[in-house]
Every structure is written in structure tokens, then in C-alpha cells.
Regions:
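Catalytic beta/alpha-barrel core
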Residues: 1-6, 24-32
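N-terminal active-site wall of soluble small-molecule enzyme domains
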Residues: 1-17
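Active-site-adjacent beta->alpha loops and helix N-cap segments on the catalytic face
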Residues: 6-11, 32-40, 102
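Conserved, mostly hydrophobic/aromatic
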Residues: 13, 87, 145
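Active-site-adjacent loop and "lid" segments of alpha/beta metabolic enzymes
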Residues: 22, 34-35, 98-106, 113-165
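Active-site glycine- and acidic-residue-rich loops that bind
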Residues: 28-30, 57-68, 93-105, 132-135
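Conserved anion-binding
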Residues: 32-92
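Conserved small/polar residues in nucleotide/adenosyl-binding loops
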Residues: 166-173
Length: 173
């Protein structure tokens, strides 16, 4: 993923990207000050990680879905396919916000039910925890998120524990 606030750097990265590996990924847009990154992705036939927040973190799933709708409409207005927006509900720190984890998992399920792709930075979940606990927390969260339909995850490539859960699939009803 091209992860910088420098638009010229993103455009330069896209211009040399080997598309035989799939579309480049722009990380990230939101429904406020970074919404123009949706336009940038659309203009370059790229995928964009669409953060479900505005000026601040969404307070609940209604607000997350409102931001999701704004980003989806913006992308479609610029010719993007809905599958080229990967929605990030923003995994929150579990320390002190345990109740928010279930909301994020429910939001992933909502995306999945709508046929939308989802992603997220899973290590946010364990931020501030002892180093030896973080892989366990992140592994548990990725397993739960995948069961809700998580499409992809932004994980620490040096921590292979989350990868061991890639065989899980959402339960079909």
C-alpha cells in the first residue's frame, strides 16, 4: 500500500507499480480532510482504504455507516467499483474501550453483508499492552474479524501468529 500524505509520492508510486500483482492500494481516505484520496485512487484505477471516520473517530456504527456511505458515493461518482473501496471501521485500543470491539466486529459484518470489502490495522487493538501479550490479542481479534467477513488486515509482517488464522471463513447461514 502507498501510505503517505504526499499526493505526488502516491502518484509516483502508482506510475511505477507492477499491475500484474493487482491494483495499487492508496492508504487512506476518510470522509473529511482526506476525502480527495478517493478521487486520487479513482483517477489512477487504484484501490483506496476508506477510513470510516470524519474529523474524529465515529462514536458508533450508525456514524461509521454514514461515513462509509459518503466515501462509497464519492468513489462511485468518480467511476470506482464498490469493491475498490476497502472500508476500515478503525480497530480501537481494547484497554479502556472493551465495549467498542464488539461494535467494530458488528460493523465488519455489516460491510460483508453489503458485499463490501473491509480491512483494518489490527495492532491498534493491542496498543499499550505488554509486548508479549500483543500477538495473542491481535491473533484473537483477526480470528473474530475474519469470522465476521474481514477481507484483509493490516498486520505486523514479523508476527506470524495472525497468519495462522487465514484458513477461517465466515459461517454461511
Amino acid at each position: 500500500a502507498l501510505d503517505t500524505s504526499n499526493k505526488k509520492a502516491i502518484e509516483a508510486g502508482i506510475s511505477v507499480y507492477n499491475r500484474s500483482k493487482g491494483k495499487p492500494i492508496v492508504n487512506s481516505a476518510d470522509a473529511a480532510g482526506r476525502i480527495e484520496y478517493v478521487d486520487l485512487a479513482a483517477a489512477n484505477d487504484a484501490i483506496v482504504i476508506a477510513l470510516c471516520n470524519g474529523e474524529g473517530i465515529a462514536k458508533d456504527n450508525d456514524e461509521r455507516m454514514m461515513y462509509c456511505q459518503t466515501l462509497l458515493e464519492r468513489g462511485m461518482e468518480h467511476g470506482m467499483e464498490p469493491t475498490d473501496l476497502w472500508f476500515d471501521p478503525l480497530f480501537l485500543v481494547v484497554k479502556g474501550m472493551q465495549d467498542k470491539q464488539m461494535e467494530v466486529l458488528e460493523c465488519i459484518k455489516m460491510f460483508s453483508d453489503m458485499g463490501l470489502n473491509s480491512t483494518g490495522g489490527l495492532s491498534n487493538n493491542s496498543n499499550g499492552m505488554p509486548k508479549h501479550i500483543r500477538p495473542i490479542m491481535d491473533s484473537a481479534l483477526v480470528a473474530m474479524a475474519m469470522m465476521q467477513g474481514l477481507t484483509s488486515a493490516i498486520v505486523n509482517p514479523n508476527d506470524l501468529r495472525p497468519v495462522s488464522y487465514t484458513h477461517l471463513r465466515a459461517h454461511e447461514t
